[in-house]
Amino acid sequence: MKEVGIVGYGSDLPKYRIKAEDIAGAWGKDAQAIKRGLVVNEKSVPGPDEDTATISVQAARRALSRAGINPKDIGAVYVGSESHPYAVKPTSGIVAEACGVSPDFTAADLEFACKAGTAGMQMCMGLVGSEMMEYAMAVGADTAQGAPGDALEYTAAAGGAAYIIGAKKEEFIAKFNGTYSYTTDTPDFWRREHEHYPKHGGRFTGEPAYFKHVLNGAKGMMAKMDTTAKDYDYCVFHQPNGKFYISAAKQLGFTEEQYKYGLLTPYLGNTYSGAVPLGLSNILDHAKADDRIFVVSYGSGAGSDAFDITVSDRISEVVDKEITTEKLLESKKYVDYAVYLKYRGKIRM
């Protein structure tokens, strides 16, 4: 299989935020205890005109801008999410049409809880690496929901990032050295048809779910590449909250200097399918040539996708072609709990 790499990337976040204090205050909870326990201070809130499709389109357009390619050369578009706006109507078709991708392409909406975006990246790697097409695009985005008063309400957020995969080395922003996946049937988090909000296994979502899959996915990737944490400059993991992320990083031997740019949850919340793609985009915004990045996603149900990536010298040419993830994080407007309920459609008669 041919070597493949990232030739374009872009991210998008809603402007609105709500602080943990506002959510806790509405339910008579101790905000400081919640912030300490989750390592989450605030989260993004999509506006009434924002959904997974609009976020995906914006991220994809920014990825195209950085790639500098003709969108009609893209042969596949995949959008991974657990909050597609339609039960029957593909988000991927909306994204492709809005970005000017030719009708001569394949598309699909993907679901695997929070790792649907990285699953799409793997599919793109295979299609481009096998020379079935010149370029392929994968998007991971969500506008996640948590039931009012549930622990998820402090973290379930919105955002996403897009990646264009190609095989021309001179176009690489970063090269994929390898990928590895670890998957089981673990029912830690679920939502049935017609239910408004997901259910979760509480403490069961930790050791037998998140940590089992992230750590085994990471160890499998390192064994495949014959590496340790010391071989990487940066790392990013799925981040349902800041506490799990930091614990996983430290258990694998990574330092704060290595994991800090990938950790967005304290300021953004959990963007589900967008979490690892967004963390990776922020790392790329700060990286330099030859930096090596370790990536592990996680999706409830459950599985992890891991990647070993090396940044190319082209990164310095493309970062400033579009708004960075850090600037999107800094551009924000706070809303109170009442506005949050209205924007998220949580007021039901």
Curated annotation (Swiss-Prot):
Biological or metabolic pathway of the protein: Metabolic intermediate biosynthesis; (R)-mevalonate biosynthesis; (R)-mevalonate from acetyl-CoA: step 2/3
Active site residues of this protein: E82 (proton donor/acceptor), C114 (acyl-thioester intermediate), H238 (proton donor/acceptor)
GO molecular function, one term: hydroxymethylglutaryl-CoA synthase activity
Pfam families: ACP_syn_III_C
Alphabetically ordered keywords of this record: Acyltransferase, Isoprene biosynthesis, Transferase
UniProt-annotated binding residues for CoA: R203, K243
EC number(s) on file: 2.3.3.10
Root EC class: transferase
SUPFAM superfamilies assigned to the protein according to its UniProt record, in alphabetical order: Thiolase-like
Residues where (3S)-3-hydroxy-3-methylglutaryl-CoA binds: D30, A31, C114, T155, T205, H238, N270, S300
Reactions catalysed, as given in the entry: acetoacetyl-CoA + acetyl-CoA + H2O = (3S)-3-hydroxy-3-methylglutaryl-CoA + CoA + H(+)
Gene Ontology terms describing biological process: farnesyl diphosphate biosynthetic process, mevalonate pathway; isopentenyl diphosphate biosynthetic process, mevalonate pathway
Function: Catalyzes the condensation of acetyl-CoA with acetoacetyl-CoA to form 3-hydroxy-3-methylglutaryl-CoA (HMG-CoA). Functions in the mevalonate (MVA) pathway leading to isopentenyl diphosphate (IPP), a key precursor for the biosynthesis of isoprenoid compounds that are building blocks of archaeal membrane lipids.
Record-stated family: Belongs to the thiolase-like superfamily. Archaeal HMG-CoA synthase family.
Subunit structure: Interacts with acetoacetyl-CoA thiolase that catalyzes the precedent step in the pathway and with a DUF35 protein. The acetoacetyl-CoA thiolase/HMG-CoA synthase complex channels the intermediate via a fused CoA-binding site, which allows for efficient coupling of the endergonic thiolase reaction with the exergonic HMGCS reaction.
Protein name, per record: Hydroxymethylglutaryl-CoA synthase
